[in-house]
Regions:
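Beta-strand/loop-dominated core regions that host nucleotide or nucleotide-derived cofactor-binding catalytic loops
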Residues: 3-101
Length: 101
């Protein structure tokens, strides 16, 4: 196994970036995300951007958790459509999700 203490879990992809307000929109395609989650956004131009989800908005309303199939927006430095969104989960937490190891 890997000695890393964190694993990345695919969440979804970038849809749009609103540069005038510094907000990124993502579509959740796989794992849900919740406020407080540590995130990693990657892409060919973007590189790797680490962030913590301080506030997620679905249809402009703040939510605690964003579920699969939902679009959400968050304050973020520039990202690009098609960037991939992951959440970083400690290997300890991962053990709670059976079948991922």
């Amino acid at each position: 196994g890997s000695a890393a203490t964190e694993r990345k879990i695919y969440v979804g992809k970038g849809i749009k970036y609103f540069s005038n307000i510094g907000v990124a929109e993502f579509l959740v395609e796989a794992a849900e995300v919740s406020v407080g989650d540590k995130l990693l956004i990657t892409g060919p131009t973007t590189g790797a951007v680490f962030a913590t989800l301080d506030e997620a908005r679905v249809e402009l309303k703040p939510v605690e958790t964003v579920k699969k199939g939902e679009h959400f927006s968050m304050k973020l430095d520039k990202i690009r459509p098609s960037d991939k969104l992951y959440k970083l989960v400690s290997t300890e937490e991962l053990k709670k999700f059976k079948g991922l190891e």
